[in-house]
């Protein structure tokens, strides 16, 4: 299969990128190195080419009412210019994908979805929304999407943005500005646990933006650092930490369900039943107590008996400890629970800890 490339591919090569296949795309996994990229985002600023992600424009008279049926979060409380992280639910209460919905007014909205699930999401949304008179436009290939992340993100980005004061954008707010003569969609969102922005703009201006930020000393970062940053921040990766068979309650995303604010939505009854009965498993944080790094699909044991599976794991550059996410039965999910992780036939001690593993200091 031929891998797709983003419009910034040649610029990534020039910046020294090493590439790997990811969800049908040839993506930069690192530039100068995972640790230095990770550190740049935690202490200063780094940028990620995330143009591979799915981007859908939604329009229609009853847009909010139609979307309300597909997600457990109350989108009706959003004002234009605000955004909501939420999940698309299937008929069984499982998570089709985690997405960000950007409210642009009563008749307009925008969705950014995961690259691996772009077609699945499109099929689900068109099936449910077109009958409600909603028009969907897939603009995934039309624009670049660049994430500028870190404590110095605002300072780095503002010089190339006109007609928008980034300081006025609160977390999970978005607006329009001008970047190199093109209208740009700019949101104060991210996937690193740090302050930052995600910028969508036409490729010509996007290439100029990349080059301008490189010239300003912003470090290009790859998927490797993106993964360690999000894991330290306790953020989920769809397809590993949750999937079609995982409910928001199991995944620790119950806070996305606005029970009292919403009428019917897909699988509400199923989720209410699960909430009343209690979940049987829960996504927890693990910290290794010595050597060994827990990786995806490694077994978690209690008293020598396998009770769960690791979904994501890495060596944390910030904490200098091995950390992981894992699903464990409720009785073994409390903070302080001692477990072991089987790594290449040997058991290594670990402990259930509070999530997130890292929290950025507030501005």
UniProtKB/Swiss-Prot annotation:
Where are the coiled-coil regions?
none
Q: Which Pfam families does this UniProt record tie to the protein?
A: GCV_T, GCV_T_C
State the signal peptide span: none
Per the record, the domain of life is Bacteria
Q: Which reactions are catalysed by this chain?
A: N(6)-[(R)-S(8)-aminomethyldihydrolipoyl]-L-lysyl-[protein] + (6S)-5,6,7,8-tetrahydrofolate = N(6)-[(R)-dihydrolipoyl]-L-lysyl-[protein] + (6R)-5,10-methylene-5,6,7,8-tetrahydrofolate + NH4(+)
Q: What is its EC number?
A: 2.1.2.10
| Regions crossing the membrane | none
GO annotation, biological process: glycine decarboxylation via glycine cleavage system
UniProt keyword annotations, A-Z:
Aminotransferase, Transferase
Q: Name one GO molecular function term.
A: transaminase activity
GO cellular component, alphabetical, reads: cytosol; glycine cleavage complex
Entry function: The glycine cleavage system catalyzes the degradation of glycine.
Q: PANTHER family, per this entry?
A: AMINOMETHYLTRANSFERASE, AMINOMETHYLTRANSFERASE, MITOCHONDRIAL
**Subunit structure of this chain's protein:** The glycine cleavage system is composed of four proteins: P, T, L and H.
Family that this chain belongs to? Belongs to the GcvT family.
Q: What is this protein called?
A: Aminomethyltransferase
Protein source organism:
Picosynechococcus sp. (strain ATCC 27264 / PCC 7002 / PR-6)
């Amino acid at each position: 299969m031929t891998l797709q490339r983003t419009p910034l591919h040649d610029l990534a090569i020039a910046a020294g990128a090493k590439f790997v296949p990811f969800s049908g795309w040839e993506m930069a996994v690192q530039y100068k190195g995972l640790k230095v990229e990770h550190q740049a985002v935690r202490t200063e600023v780094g940028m990620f080419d995330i143009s591979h992600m799915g981007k859908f424009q939604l329009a229609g008279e009853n847009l909010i009412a139609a979307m309300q049926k597909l997600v457990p979060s109350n989108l009706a409380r959003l004002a234009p210019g605000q955004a909501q992280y939420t999940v698309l639910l299937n008929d069984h209460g499982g998570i089709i994908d985690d997405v960000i919905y950007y409210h642009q007014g009563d008749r307009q909205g925008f969705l950014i979805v995961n690259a691996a699930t772009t077609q699945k999401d499109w099929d689900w949304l068109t099936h449910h929304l077109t009958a409600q008179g909603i028009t969907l436009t897939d603009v995934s290939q039309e624009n670049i999407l660049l994430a500028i992340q870190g404590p110095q993100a605002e300072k780095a980005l503002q010089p190339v943005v006109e007609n928008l004061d980034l300081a006025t954008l609160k977390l999970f707010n978005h607006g329009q500005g001008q970047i190199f003569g093109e209208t740009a969609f700019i949101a104060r969102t991210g996937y690193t646990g740090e302050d930052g922005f995600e910028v969508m703009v036409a490729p010509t201006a996007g290439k100029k933006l990349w080059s301008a930020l490189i010239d300003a000393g912003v470090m290009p970062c790859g998927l490797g650092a993106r993964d360690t940053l999000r894991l330290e921040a306790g953020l989920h990766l769809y397809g590993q930490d949750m999937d079609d068979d995982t409910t928001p309650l199991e995944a620790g995303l119950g806070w996305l369900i606005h029970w009292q604010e919403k009428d019917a939505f897909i699988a509400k009854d199923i989720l209410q039943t699960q909430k009343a009965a209690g979940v049987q498993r829960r996504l927890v944080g693990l910290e290794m107590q010595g050597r060994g790094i827990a990786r995806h699909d490694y077994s978690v044991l209690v008293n020598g008996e396998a009770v769960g599976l690791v979904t994501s794991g890495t060596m944390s550059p910030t904490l200098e400890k091995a950390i992981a996410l894992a699903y464990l039965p409720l009785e073994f999910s409390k903070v302080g629970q001692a477990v072991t992780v089987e790594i290449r036939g040997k058991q290594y001690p670990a402990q259930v800890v509070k999530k997130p593993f890292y929290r950025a200091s507030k501005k």
